[in-house]
Amino acid sequence: MAQPQQHKGGYKQINKALNICAFEDYLSAQLKHLPQLADVEQLSPRVIRVLGQNAGKGTNTYIVGTGPQRLIIDTGQGIPEWADILDATLKERSISLSHVFLSHWHGDHTGGVPDLLRLYPNLAGAIYKNSPGSDQQPIDDGQVFRVEGATIRAVHGPGHSHDHMCFILEEENAMFTGDNVLGHGTSAVEELGVYMETLRKLNSHHCAVGYPAHGDVITNLPAKIAGELAQKMRREKQVLLTLDRINKESRRTGQVVLVHGDGIDEEVRKMALEPFIDEVLRKLAEDGKVAFEMRGGVKRWFGVGVL
């Protein structure tokens, strides 16, 4: 998987094959001011966070519940230190695990499963994921799981990935948002239109707090989701305005990017901004606001809707 040299691991991964795209501000300013997070932190009476030890503060693993048997959400990227820290944390608190939830298939969330099974072979039948593999258990939208002190309700939220699941912690009116809503910065997406619908769906649950897969606790989840939606709609408007400005001749994606992303590093432009603009254009085409024609094997876009 090709990536910009200075944006490896954690929630900066870009999978070009799946057209997971990112924003220029996501890849620059947002990476410069990450907060200091402890390797292990008790966030609430029911939630302990363990950092995945991968880049950019890594992927959060959450230990959920209050009793001797609890569940965890996500397993990091497979960094050996993560397994050591998790094992020590569980032993110090005399905790065993009953369920392992994977928010989605990306490697920085599933990579620790082999280490987890090496440490706890009894969990072999307790790995849960939407669209599961042959050795995993299914998670369905609305499915409820319980451990002492915690009732977890699964919410299917595709867009970042087709199998993405979020989890509501009923006792706290909180949501484990996975990669759909990050503690810091903006998520990358596979399908922008689907992702925006997912954000609206998540917002409809009216959870107050978010526990993201990357970054610190989101203390005002409705405001964060509203900001994400506003940003996506603002980007759409910018692309439409750009097309309108240059519409005397239909343009390919790269030319729209050159106008829209002036001043962006060329590698970031190619790896992040251009795929993102292409995703915006595809969504706008589905909405009937833009269209394209093929010239010399290249899509050339033009606006057809009213701004």
Curated annotation (Swiss-Prot):
Record EC number: 3.1.2.-
Catalysed reactions, as listed in the record: atrochrysone carboxyl-[ACP] + H2O = atrochrysone carboxylate + holo-[ACP] + H(+)
Active site annotation, chain numbering: 108
Gene3D superfamilies found in the cross-reference section: Ribonuclease Z/Hydroxyacylglutathione hydrolase-like, Winged helix-like DNA-binding domain superfamily/Winged helix DNA-binding domain
EC supergroup of this enzyme: hydrolase
Residues the record lists as binding Zn(2+) 2: 108-109
Pathway(s) per entry: Secondary metabolite biosynthesis
Keyword field: Hydrolase, Metal-binding, Zinc
Textual note on the cofactor: Binds 2 Zn(2+) ions per subunit.
Gene Ontology molecular functions: hydrolase activity; metal ion binding
Cofactor: Zn(2+)
An individual GO BP term: monodictyphenone biosynthetic process
Disruption phenotype: Impairs the production of monodictyphenone and any of the intermediates of the pathway.
Binding site for Zn(2+) 1: 104, 106
Domain of life: Eukaryota
Family: Belongs to the metallo-beta-lactamase superfamily.
Protein task: Atrochrysone carboxyl ACP thioesterase; part of the gene cluster that mediates the biosynthesis of monodictyphenone, a prenyl xanthone derivative. The pathway begins with the synthesis of atrochrysone thioester by the polyketide synthase (PKS) mdpG. The atrochrysone carboxyl ACP thioesterase mdpF then breaks the thioester bond and releases the atrochrysone carboxylic acid from mdpG. The atrochrysone carboxylic acid is then converted to atrochrysone which is further transformed into emodin anthrone.
UniProt protein name: Atrochrysone carboxyl ACP thioesterase
The organism of origin for this protein: Emericella nidulans (strain FGSC A4 / ATCC 38163 / CBS 112.46 / NRRL 194 / M139)
